[in-house]
Amino acid sequence: MIRPLLAALAMMTTLDSALAQAIPDAATQEVLIKTTLMSFNDANVTGNYAVFHARLAKPFRDQFSPEKLKTTFKTFAEKEVDIGFVVAKAPIPDAEVKIDDNGTLRIDGHFDTQPSQIAYTLKFIRSDGDWKAVGIDVNIGKPPAKDAPPPAAAKPPASAESGKIQFGK
């Protein structure tokens, strides 16, 4: 009697792990992208990184204080960069969305904006029951030429402003 129960419990645990690692659908990805970038933008525009910090994954929050975030992204604040308008734009993927062996969801993309393009790499883990950011890399620069090949996920456009921070770095 105990053996079948243990087998059923093991299957449920495996199924639960598999479900937790499912790639979110396109609508959820867009919400993750936009909410992360808008929290990031609000922090840069106001100079208050407390709310942005609170929305990050716990391991990220433990490693990076709001003050460290402010220092890391000071270029955006100094140049008064405001990317709030991206909420009205559709994100364009630059690479296939994937979850690595550590359970980190990676989303690479950009927004078709002029005169500069906003490119991002966002990394999320499951934290407190939701996908929360553990890495953010935002680059604002000239978009690639129309006849140029699509940008590689690892190579952002020539940046006027950029900032990157990631858990464990």
Regions found by a protein language model. Give the residues of each.
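Exposed beta-sheet edge and beta->alpha loop/turn motif
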Residues: 91-169
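Sec-dependent N-terminal signal peptides
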Residues: 4-14
